[in-house]
Amino acid sequence: VLAGPGWGPVKASYALSIAADGTLEQVTSIQTEQLRGKKTVLAPQVLTLPAPVKRTVGIAANFLCDNSGYILGADNKGNPQRSLACFAACKALHTSVLGGVASPSAQALLAFFRTWIPEYTLEHPALAEYREDILSGANLLFRYNGSYIHEDPEIRRAWERRYRADTDSPRGHLLVTGEEGPVESVHPAIQECGPA
């Protein structure tokens, strides 16, 4: 299944369940068991999420799913100031995209970013079980009221508006739909297709 513009396959390992006031209530592993050789291992689940940015050395946050440095403002990379800067960038992105969205899940996510204190990440009881894996770079996403936040129709529309506004792609004949529209300049990498 091809994702629409602004969406792509993203590996995610943990869901952060938040309350209406933004409080982190629970962390759940969403990893799936996969057979690798003769061993069964836990692997991140691949979900269709807002397209991740291509990172180099700069700070660039992803919308709705990212690692702990961006989502929580803490990681185990040994540079706490950078983690705080990553969190600030992530908070700014979510505030910008969701500022006018009235859905309860959008408001809960905005409350999370307003109230989360990165310096207390290591002490938060909801993170205890998976702390090491989370701080090692596993991707995190959000749940509100039992549902993934990225499935909220209002949030999806807000992301698509933002993505279209940020895209200065030339218009042309689209190969997949046959329609006239903006041509994507960057496509997700094709993975796991054997020797190519």
Task: Identify what each model region corresponds to.
Residues 174-177:
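Short cysteine-rich clusters marking metal-coordination/redox-active sites
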Residues 179-196:
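Domain-exit/linker segments immediately C-terminal to small folded modules
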